[in-house]
Amino acid sequence: MLTFRVIGDWDEDAVRVSWTASRLASNPRVERLIDTAWAGARQRKGIQLFDGPMCRLESFSATPTSLDLHVSRTSYRTFLGTNMSLGVVGSFGPSVLANPIGLSTSMQSSDGHLLLGRRNEAVAYYPGRIHPFAGAAEP
């Protein structure tokens, strides 16, 4: 299910991002799950992996005139092993999730069509699927 935590129309200077200490919870069992997920993805033929840096959303505050994002560092490897692994939240709770900030956009052509892309076959999740143009916030 898609959940929007906040929706608004903020000017560029009304959006502020600040670094904060990570509250990502971990333990040896979660680290083993991350290792296992990463090793499994690496073994899939044709998949290209890069453990790139990402911004984890720690908290936010929003008003009609401002949006403050408080972020910490996480990585693609942690994202793959937590957010993309079934059962992690049920077993360990949401505090173990990488929770990177995802960015998506929608574009409408002048003749009224919605522009979408097809994900590359070499990505670790949802390969070949139709998808909005998207990515993740990086430090």
Label every model-predicted segment.
Residues 1-139:
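N-terminal leader/linker segments that precede catalytic domains of diphosphate-processing enzymes
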